[in-house]
Amino acid sequence: MESTLSASNMQDPSSSPLEKCLGSANGNGDLDSEEGSSLEETGFNWGEYLEETGASAAPHTSFKHVEISIQSNFQPGMKLEVANKNNPDTYWVATIITTCGQLLLLRYCGYGEDRRADFWCDVVIADLHPVGWCTQNNKVLMPPDAIKEKYTDWTEFLIRDLTGSRTAPANLLEGPLRGKGPIDLITVGSLIELQDSQNPFQYWIVSVIENVGGRLRLRYVGLEDTESYDQWLFYLDYRLRPVGWCQENKYRMDPPSEIYPLKMASEWKCTLEKSLIDAAKFPLPMEVFKDHADLRSHFFTVGMKLETVNMCEPFYISPASVTKVFNNHFFQVTIDDLRPEPSKLSMLCHADSLGILPVQWCLKNGVSLTPPKGYSGQDFDWADYHKQHGAQEAPPFCFRNTSFSRGFTKNMKLEAVNPRNPGELCVASVVSVKGRLMWLHLEGLQTPVPEVIVDVESMDIFPVGWCEANSYPLTAPHKTVSQKKRKIAVVQPEKQLPPTVPVKKIPHDLCLFPHLDTTGTVNGKYCCPQLFINHRCFSGPYLNKGRIAELPQSVGPGKCVLVLKEVLSMIINAAYKPGRVLRELQLVEDPHWNFQEETLKAKYRGKTYRAVVKIVRTSDQVANFCRRVCAKLECCPNLFSPVLISENCPENCSIHTKTKYTYYYGKRKKISKPPIGESNPDSGHPKPARRRKRRKSIFVQKKRRSSAVDFTAGSGEESEEEDADAMDDDTASEETGSELRDDQTDTSSAEVPSARPRRAVTLRSGSEPVRRPPPERTRRGRGAPAASSAEEGEKCPPTKPEGTEDTKQEEEERLVLESNPLEWTVTDVVRFIKLTDCAPLAKIFQEQDIDGQALLLLTLPTVQECMELKLGPAIKLCHQIERVKVAFYAQYAN
């Protein structure tokens, strides 16, 4: 029985038809990165692992295929047309000097070797076009002013400069492919032609099922209902060609022999016709194949002997023979088998196939050569073998350079494909390097395998962090130092905790931390104590108190990063706006922390948001980290901490407990409270506002949030409590109100309108019977009449004020909402903005997915920060937002 495989089976630039296998016999078990990978389950971290093992990561430059995959499709020397900086209505031809991702370094033609005017631009947002675009669109081509006098005839200069040059591809400068790299162009569903593993002149179309950083999971068309024959190949594999290539070269388009019996010939024909039509409709850009290496001619002849890595079991090197030559590019190599009924294993090779070696290579490099099956001697000897079989050795010049190691050395770490389970990538260690071959130890496998032999240019090996960068599971080692205890992030129900625990007051400048018993633990400094969710503590404006109460009372003990990541995930899910909390957590950092970056997710309204958050790694920083997070979320610093709070919180946060919304709706409660966890000797005694505190006042306004978000948390009593708390917070910033009025920077404040005196100049509502102050009066005291008028404006029907002109203007600005802003979609928000004098900003709302609830949360600082608006337009926009808020409270707050 003879089986034939492609030489790419041996992890070569032609990498191999490897089947994906995770939990299924055929090697195609599904991997759901959303459900969590082994990285998440074990909390494996490359940084800690390298630190604890004392190993180093293989250099990124050693992975040739990965380096190529992240290169831009734009090449130095390409020409394009770009808008002039000083005169954007005109354009000029520029040359690409270098690239960095989607950034291009350009130089206007005419500057020669002068680099002083070089400039960077982003392909996605810059005004770039292919050469010839200006002529087609009647645009003006004009050289920059700095070199305008350098030549008298610029037309002649351009003709001379552009002759023989390459223009940047139009499809990469315009349309959906703009700025995308080669691997980004390959999408799920893309169709490609795949060379048969047995016959170099036969192809069949495959569909891309997954694209993991250029590593493609491929499925033959016609086999959509089964994954048994799926293969994994890197997109640079020579066996992959654009659809139509086979026909152009007059090769056969037939399904492989192993799948042909699965369907009738007529069915295969219909499948092919449909695939060709689909491929013509959505062709794969040719830029995907621009880095494919051209195959050089080989010099092998039938009967030549060589040594080769066993393609089915890449753990051994065996004697082999050239058994067939197809043409000057392809030949067949078969592993020698001396048994009477040999089971021949063959592979398709080309001149640069990986894993084929000259005779005596193993002897020269001190590597064991596995004798052929049926060989009678004890130790294999090529001299005796030649005498017995009279074979000819393949001359050394037939092989590529066999001594190039690409910088790999012993004990380096990397990520590698499990040859018995090609859908699985593992942590791997370089055991030894011989010439251009490496022996890898794969860690963490359920069924251990011998050391895997791979070429240094294999496309089945990847640098440290590649899986994480591509959101793909990585099989971690079974026992790393940091994982000595497998009970990580144990979530304990409340009933398992003792009923009462002594409580000590936590000083604001100290972090109380339980004693860690690290007996028997090599890695105690990375062990986090039990963290408690003290749901009785004040939850602040971001978090839903009801959802907090539903969380388990404790998490841990376990590895610091994993425990804290679990706690932060729970906190995010307990938020009114998970995405907003995620954004706040991004800002928590300290230069003195020993941290690592972790990706956290927030799901809201069917969308998933991701952000990188810094999490401390060592136990001595956990308490400080918890307090910093709580401070950022404006909640009690003991909301989650290493200390269990049974009854009374040491921070006395009960004074901030959320009470009935109706209580504040009808009454004016004047208190001035500092943020929790910060000492303020004057707490509870409002002080007159002072001008020099304006900067601080803006910060306070930024930190206050609208109670509008609280309505999304649920209904009934809980919702009312959340609203009341938000309003209570608003009164705390009252002392800064008059400062802000002076420069009108609180236009966007998201406070409840009835909870503070309004600024009649810019925040007018049709229901507010407040007279506009005289123009020369820049400051207004916060007397009781102003406060009561604000309340009455919310509670009572509008009464006619004395100033009829002011009333008329207020009536004009009064907004009547047809629907509740809390229920507005992004489209509704965009539609509203377009009806205002801020219509040009509607695009920003569309791009940032701002719905009604998010709209009600916007404040002047957030508008300036997130929308990158100057003060004038920001105030103008915030005035419109304030109109919505006023109308919301007037129409829907009841």
Swiss-Prot record:
GO terms for molecular function: chromatin binding; histone binding; transcription corepressor activity. Gene3D superfamilies: 2.30.30.140, SLED domain (3.90.1150.190), Transcription Factor, Ets-1 (1.10.150.50). Residues 769-778, 792-807 have a biased composition (Basic and acidic residues). MBT repeats lie at residues 44-144, 152-256, 266-372, 380-477. One of its GO terms (biological process) is negative regulation of gene expression. It comes from the Eukaryota. Residues 1-17 have a biased composition (Polar residues). It is found in: Nucleus. Residues 1-39, 672-813 are annotated as: Disordered. Residues 687-706 have a biased composition (Basic residues). Keywords: Nucleus, Repeat, Repressor. Residues 824-887 form the SAM domain. Transmembrane segments: none annotated. Residues 717-737 have a biased composition (Acidic residues). Transcriptional repressor of HOXB13 gene. Interacts with YY1. Interacts with methylated histones H3K9me2 and H4K20me2, but not with H3K4me2, nor H3K9Ac. This is Scm-like with four MBT domains protein 2. The lineage of its organism: Eukaryota, Metazoa, Chordata, Craniata, Vertebrata.
